[in-house]
């Protein structure tokens, strides 16, 4: 009967582990690592359709971009959009998570309703909100008229177009962030909350002094996700 030493057994386990991980590593190299390095290389070249091979020009593209006023204008708008969407979407997401965390017969329906905008394509959402913001006949202008306020075409004004898009984005993104906050809230031991209730703490006190501090890691993760998502929106701008 053949016996193996501890070192041989460990080597065998490691070999099996690497064999199991290899397919995932191959896919990651092909579809993640290689495109990143390829994109970096192409950003340092001059390439046009019909050329056999791109001409390497170093950092000229980056220098040209840094000297473009249009680039800095776009960056400013993007940063402004991120600032006016990240905090509101996180606040609304946390509020929704606190609501759906309560046990009731309608909890499943409410969670689905809040999350539904997340699974809708941005093109469809942008089209819906474009009709809402439509001048004169749109739902938003009709609401303003009913309140005695002069209608405004929010999508044609520099002062209102970004806030209008930000409102639409928060409406879509809040349900997505709600899922992470809900997971964080449910990971908090109920014994901690119960002990606080026995000591006479109310719902708001428990939320402010127990739930929020324990959600610090979740806040860090959610803020990173929200920042990343706010920088990669394109389709709604084209449609609206």
How would you describe each model-predicted region?
Residues 4, 9-240:
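A structural signal for multi-pass alpha-helical bundles of membrane permease subunits
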């Amino acid at each position: 009967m053949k016996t193996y030493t501890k070192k041989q057994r460990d080597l065998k386990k490691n070999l099996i582990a690497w064999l199991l991980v290899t397919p995932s590593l191959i896919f990651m190299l092909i579809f993640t690592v290689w495109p990143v390095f390829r994109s970096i290389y192409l950003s340092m070249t001059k390439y046009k359709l019909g050329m056999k091979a791109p001409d390497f020009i170093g950092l000229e593209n980056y220098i040209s971009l840094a000297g473009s006023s249009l680039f800095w204008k776009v960056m400013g708008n993007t940063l402004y959009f991120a600032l006016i969407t990240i905090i509101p979407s996180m606040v609304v997401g946390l509020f929704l998570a606190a609501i759906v965390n309560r046990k009731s017969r309608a909890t499943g329906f409410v969670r689905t309703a809040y999350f539904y905008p997340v699974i809708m394509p941005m093109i469809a959402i942008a089209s819906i909100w474009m009709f809402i913001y439509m001048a004169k006949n749109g739902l938003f202008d009709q609401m303003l008229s009913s309140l005695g306020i002069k209608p405004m075409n929010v999508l044609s004004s520099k002062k209102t177009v970004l806030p209008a898009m930000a409102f639409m984005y928060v409406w879509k993104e809040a349900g997505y962030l709600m899922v992470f906050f809900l997971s964080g809230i449910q990971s908090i031991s109920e014994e901690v909350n119960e002990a606080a209730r026995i000591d006479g703490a109310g719902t708001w006190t428990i939320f402010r002094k127990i739930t929020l501090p324990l959600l610090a890691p979740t806040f860090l993760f959610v803020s990173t996700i929200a920042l990343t998502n706010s920088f990669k929106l394109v389709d709604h701008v084209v449609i609206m």
